[in-house]
């Protein structure tokens, strides 16, 4: 099958990290050298009690994956804010200090894809999904891709390897849907040869011909810490013939039995790494949501127990099916509600509720509301996660604020318009029009939360901080967004209930919304 081959920057070699949207990234930069202009050691450490090499290691990781614009040009305050965000993704306490827990978590195997895309200082059109992160031969709301394994590892039986690959592709094809949303059909077939395949899968060591050398078993030393690259994947928009291909480091010891990996073992769990890499091959970027398959850090979860998160699903739907009301509302909760929580504590027109949860902590520092699991992701099994979710649903009351667009809160309307203009690349006129929907949604959400019969779930609070890189970026899809606006306008002209009608976002709407949203 012919592959699409526009100009595009290489996807970062992936050592694996994973909500809603997809753009290709450049290859990882080399670790930043130490200079005399770097932050003073006492400012970097902040009381964390770790050595200089550990601090430089964490700073290098933060710059490499997009949390810092440049470690030579960050003020102590900027560094601490970026570090707290990095700690949130690492699932350790957001102390703002480089401590042992942060160093340990940052040393775990992960994907080399960038986590955070730094915004341009001026409005320039970024590469769109259709150019860099979407298969060009997708037809309508369906895409058919062929895969082939050209070079196997000797660690796993070949037949068993093919079975795992089939299951991993089936995971994406069977779960990439949301009730009452447009159906995107993903079809995967095994090709008869490498030349016929869209996605070529192989194992290799060291320099293997694609400019992204593997680092060998257990990785390489960075400072006094190891950085370990397990695999890398190329986005659909990368130059042929590598676009869509997935490579694994054959110097590692690969395993398909989940009982053989984990604490005290250097074996790498192939099924989960592969499932994550397929997301990149489909054009999905990383998500900061720990529950998402596209979160950048590996988990040892059996493939038959992996559940795609709402971020993963919306990434596929938006990429191949176009703009979606539901996914836009998810974006709204991430981009508008989260932004409000990062800048407002007790503003007029804001409703809030407190948390009585026993197995999560809340931290407030420098104006940012931070929400964190007490235990690291590496120790959380799938069964633990299910039990925790059910327990949290019973005990949760929430701890986030909901902004409201009102006559005495014009700043919230202005924020919404700015987000829509820059984030969705809408014109000022379209942004003002869509802001009506935004404000109606927020008003309805506020009323729904204050309803005495309301029983919120853990997922509502989690999503306030769960901005996935995939769903958070809508560039290149503004035409589809404008279609949603026009559709809402036509509904209003026909006197039909729609998002431009404040009564549209009622209890029934939010009950249905969160029924799917909290899965």
From Swiss-Prot:
Effect of gene knockout: RNAi-mediated knockdown causes a delay in larval to adult development with reduced motility and feeding. Also reduces fecundity in adults. Larvae have molting defects characterized by incomplete cuticle shedding leaving a constriction ring in the larvae anterior part. Reduces survival upon Gram-negative bacterium P.luminescense infection or heat stress. Production of extra- and intra-cellular reactive oxygen species (ROS) and protein oxidation are increased whereas vit-6 transcription and dehydroergosterol (DHE) uptake are reduced. Moreover, causes constitutive daf-16 nuclear localization.
Compartmental location: Secreted, Extracellular space, Extracellular matrix
Name recorded for this polypeptide: Matrix metalloproteinase-B
Gene Ontology MF: a single term: metalloendopeptidase activity
GO CC annotations on file: extracellular matrix; extracellular space
Enzyme Commission numbers on file: 3.4.24.-
Top-rank lineage group of the source organism: Eukaryota
Main location: secreted
Domain commentary: The conserved cysteine present in the cysteine-switch motif binds the catalytic zinc ion, thus inhibiting the enzyme. The dissociation of the cysteine from the zinc ion upon the activation-peptide release activates the enzyme.
Known function: Metalloprotease involved in molting, a process during larval stages in which a new cuticle is formed and the old cuticle is shed. Plays a role in thermotolerance probably by preventing the accumulation of oxidized lipoproteins and cholesterol.
């Amino acid at each position: 099958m012919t592959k699409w081959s526009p100009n595009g920057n290489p996807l970062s070699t992936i050592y694996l990290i994973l909500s809603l949207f997809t753009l290709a990234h450049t290859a990882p930069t080399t670790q930043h050298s130490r200079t005399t202009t770097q932050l003073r050691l006492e400012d970097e450490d902040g009381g964390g009690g770790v050595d200089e090499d550990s601090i430089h290691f964490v700073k290098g990781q933060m710059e490499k994956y997009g949390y810092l614009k440049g470690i030579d040009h960050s003020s102590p305050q900027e560094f601490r804010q970026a570090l707290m965000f990095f700690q949130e993704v690492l699932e350790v306490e957001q102390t703002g200090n480089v401590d042992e827990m942060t160093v340990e978590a940052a040393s775990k195997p992960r994907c080399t894809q960038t986590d955070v895309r730094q915004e341009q200082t001026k409005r320039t059109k970024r590469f769109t999904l259709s150019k860099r992160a979407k298969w060009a031969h997708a037809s309508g709301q369906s895409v058919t891709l062929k895969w082939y394994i050209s070079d196997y590892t000797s660690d796993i039986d070949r037949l068993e390897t093919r079975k795992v690959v089939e299951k991993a592709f089936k995971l994406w094809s069977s779960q990439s849907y949301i009730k009452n949303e447009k159906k995107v059909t993903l079809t995967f077939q095994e090709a008869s040869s490498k030349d016929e395949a869209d996605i070529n899968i192989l194992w290799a060591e060291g320099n293997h011909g694609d400019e992204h050398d593997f680092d060998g078993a257990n990785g390489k030393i960075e400072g006094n810490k190891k950085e370990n690259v397990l695999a890398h994947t190329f986005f659909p928009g990368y130059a042929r013939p590598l676009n869509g291909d997935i490579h694994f480091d054959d110097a590692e010891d690969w395993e398909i039995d989940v009982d053989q990996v984990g604490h005290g073992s250097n074996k790498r769990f192939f099924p989960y790494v592969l499932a994550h890499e397929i997301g990149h091959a489909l054009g999905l970027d990383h998500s900061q949501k720990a529950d998402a398959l596209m979160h950048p850090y590996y988990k040892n979860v059996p493939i038959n127990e992996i559940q795609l998160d709402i971020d993963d699903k919306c990434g596929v739907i938006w990429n191949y099916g176009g703009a979606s009301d539901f996914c836009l509302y998810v974006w709204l909760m991430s981009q508008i509600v989260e932004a409000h929580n990062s800048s407002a504590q007790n503003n007029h027109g804001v409703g809030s509720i407190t948390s009585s949860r026993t197995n999560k902590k809340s931290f407030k520092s420098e104006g940012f509301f931070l929400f964190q699991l007490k235990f690291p992701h590496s120790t959380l099994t799938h069964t633990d996660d299910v039990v925790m979710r059910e327990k949290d649903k019973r005990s949760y009351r929430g701890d986030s604020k909901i902004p409201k667009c009102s006559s005495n809160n014009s700043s919230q309307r202005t924020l919404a318009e700015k987000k829509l203009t820059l984030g969705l690349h809408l014109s000022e006129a379209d942004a003002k029009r869509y802001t009506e929907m935004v404000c109606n949604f927020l008003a309805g959400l506020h009323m729904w939360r204050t309803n005495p019969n309301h029983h919120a779930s853990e997922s509502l609070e989690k999503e306030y901080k769960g901005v996935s890189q995939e769903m958070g970026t809508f560039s290149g899809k503004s035409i589809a967004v404008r279609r949603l606006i026009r559709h809402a306008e036509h509904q209003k002209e026909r006197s039909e209930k729609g998002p431009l009608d404040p009564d549209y976002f009622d209890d029934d709407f939010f009950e249905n919304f969160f029924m799917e949203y909290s899965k």
